[in-house]
């Protein structure tokens, strides 16, 4: 991971929006990927950081809250007990653990309706049964090792 991305991660962990903006925007503009690799964000409140185009690889986001934006990418990361209540997000996740996630009727992982809807996709991820049912109601795509289900 680059020194710039490390400083961005440190600013997010410190909940320091001015430092985040100072580090990010000269180097990484809106719509460009911000890639975090092997970073710890456990317990972090992302409320003031729009996370669109954030990429988390091999990261720990356990017990984080207010993860929102589109798209957000997770690969081989622990995202356990994350608080998604009131959040709107489009997530692409592969090989992650989302067990224990919190959500409510305001939580939205699909934008729009029908074939043109933007849908979150969870590939080979660990999910609680209740979360899978919640995703089914919304139309989230869940892809497992042995089958492809559009729920």
What role is predicted for each listed range?
Residues 6-9, 14-151:
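Tandem repeat scaffolds
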């Amino acid at each position: 991971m680059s020194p710039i991305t490390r400083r961005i991660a440190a600013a997010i962990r410190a909940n320091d929006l001015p430092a985040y903006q100072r580090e990010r925007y000269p180097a990484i503009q809106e719509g460009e990927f911000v890639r975090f690799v092997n970073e710890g964000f456990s317990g972090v409140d992302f409320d003031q950081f729009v996370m669109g185009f954030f990429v988390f690889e091999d990261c720990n986001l356990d017990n984080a809250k207010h993860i929102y934006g589109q798209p957000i990418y997770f690969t081989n990361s622990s995202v356990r007990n994350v608080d998604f209540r009131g959040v709107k997000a489009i997530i692409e996740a592969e090989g992650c653990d989302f067990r224990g996630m919190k959500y409510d009727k305001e939580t939205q992982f699909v934008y729009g309706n029908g074939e043109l809807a933007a849908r979150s996709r969870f590939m080979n991820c660990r999910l609680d049964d209740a979360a899978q049912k919640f995703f089914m109601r919304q139309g989230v795509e869940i892809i497992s090792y042995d089958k492809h289900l559009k729920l």
